[in-house]
Amino acid sequence: MMSRRKFLLLTGAAAAGAILTPQISAKTQFIESPEEVREKRRWAMAVDVERCTQCMEELIAKTGDEKIKPPCVVACDKENNVPEFEEERFDPQWMRIAKLKLDKPEVNPKEYYIPLLCNHCEHPPCVQVCLTKASFKRPDGIVEIDMHRCIGCRYCMIACPYGARCFNFIDPREGLKEVNPNVQMRTEGVVEKCTFCVHRIDEAVKKGEEPIPACVEACHKYGKGALVFGNIKDPNSEISKILRENIVVQLRANLGTDPHVFYAKLGGE
């Protein structure tokens, strides 16, 4: 039988617990998880092809070098620890510039310059073929690679219709003059690619700011402002307005990958 003294001690402890335990009310504000925050966003990039072409033509005319890297590529390499080796064939390319002509040169003989990078597809084939699930797509559309899981099988490189992935035949650190500590270093024997500067995105979202990838920042500071980045789930964002007001092209859209790099004003459209 419980003594009177023990009964009073137990009831007193229970009362104290009721007083000290915080009560959850309808007004309680819950902090959103990173996944919930990301689901509210879908990041994408838009390219003004006319401005990009003008930038490259002026750089080539000034330097005489058709392989010159424009400000966007230089900034991307520096920001993301992309190495440069003596033998160009070993260089990873997160962003590169391609020259192209339209299908009917007799109608429009003009040549255009466009940036090529990871398209962060809605249905990324690289993710589908990855043996170790190292390649994955976040709720906000960013396609990433977990370097700790990548075994360098290169199936993703074969599956990518945009040639956006590179294999590290050499330790990247051997081709770097300086290192950005904010970006993870890769190793020899793994695949890497553009991340839309995901470290900048996550930091900006935490602060309630608009993220700006390094290439976009450099394009507006040193180039022609051809690149625009933003959240296409926000109808008031600059990129949403561009997509509404222009005829845009997605590379190899017929493959059903739904790429999220959009090219505007290609062919004077």
UniProtKB/Swiss-Prot annotation:
The keyword Kinase does not apply. Keywords: 4Fe-4S, Cell membrane, Electron transport, Iron, Iron-sulfur, Membrane, Metal-binding, Oxidoreductase, Signal, Transport. [4Fe-4S] cluster 4 binds at residues 130, 150, 153, 156. Its main location: membrane. It comes from the Archaea. Binds 4 [4Fe-4S] clusters. Predicted to be exported by the Tat system. The position of the signal peptide cleavage has been experimentally proven. Residues 1-26 form the signal peptide. Residues 141-170 form the 4Fe-4S ferredoxin-type domain. Pfam families: Fer4_11 (PF13247). NCBIfam families: DsrO (NF045797). This is Hdr-like menaquinol oxidoreductase iron-sulfur subunit 1. The gene is hmeA.
